[in-house]
Amino acid sequence: GVDSSFLRL
């Protein structure tokens, strides 16, 4: 989800 994408940063 969105959280996963943010953690990838």
Curated annotation (Swiss-Prot):
Keywords: Amidation, Neuropeptide, Secreted. It comes from the Eukaryota. It is found in: Secreted. One of its GO terms (cellular component) is extracellular region. The modification Leucine amide is found at L9. Its main location: secreted. GO terms for biological process: neuropeptide signaling pathway. Coiled coil: none annotated. FMRFamides and FMRFamide-like peptides are neuropeptides. Belongs to the FARP (FMRF amide related peptide) family. This is Extended FMRFamide-4. It comes from Namaquaphasma ookiepense (Gladiator bug).
